[in-house]
């Protein structure tokens, strides 16, 4: 999956061994954790002008790539409560064709290069690309690195469940 704009050029390949090289070391670290807990190999490369554009467009492109790789019938829902040292973060996902994101975390902007706005842009982009509802809620913690990493790991775990093949369409309507 490729997304090219005047602000970014991003390639996401799911199921391919390789590196995650976005030229943003924090995002690389978070995406590596996400991929591990998702249980999928992925290769990601990116160039960008602003970090805001990078985090948002990576989310969109990753969501589109995940959507493209969904089985015909899939579990749809996934949840995780992810601890990381002082942090405890709840993540809930519904791949429902209804994009929405709620990111409720309390971190100090610019602590170690982390910003709430970047996490929110990534999650909103992921929700749009995957066409999913995503909720992330910080239950405890103060360290920005731990909170954001717990969120990315939790997203991976929740999506690992939500994207698993199912025997039926997981909707009382019969269609998502």
Swiss-Prot record:
InterPro entries: IGPD_sf, ImidazoleglycerolP_deHydtase, ImidazoleglycerP_deHydtase_CS, Ribosomal_Su5_D2-typ_SF. It is found in: Cytoplasm. Its EC number is 4.2.1.19. It catalyses: D-erythro-1-(imidazol-4-yl)glycerol 3-phosphate = 3-(imidazol-4-yl)-2-oxopropyl phosphate + H2O. One of its GO terms (molecular function) is imidazoleglycerol-phosphate dehydratase activity. It holds the Pfam family IGPD. PROSITE patterns: IGP_DEHYDRATASE_2 (PS00955). It is an enzyme of class 4 (lyase). The keyword Lyase applies. Pathway: Amino-acid biosynthesis; L-histidine biosynthesis; L-histidine from 5-phospho-alpha-D-ribose 1-diphosphate: step 6/9. Keywords: Amino-acid biosynthesis, Cytoplasm, Histidine biosynthesis, Lyase. One of its GO terms (biological process) is L-histidine biosynthetic process. GO terms for cellular component: cytoplasm. Coiled coil: none annotated. HAMAP family: HisB. Belongs to the imidazoleglycerol-phosphate dehydratase family. PANTHER family: IMIDAZOLEGLYCEROL-PHOSPHATE DEHYDRATASE, IMIDAZOLEGLYCEROL-PHOSPHATE DEHYDRATASE HIS7. This is Imidazoleglycerol-phosphate dehydratase.
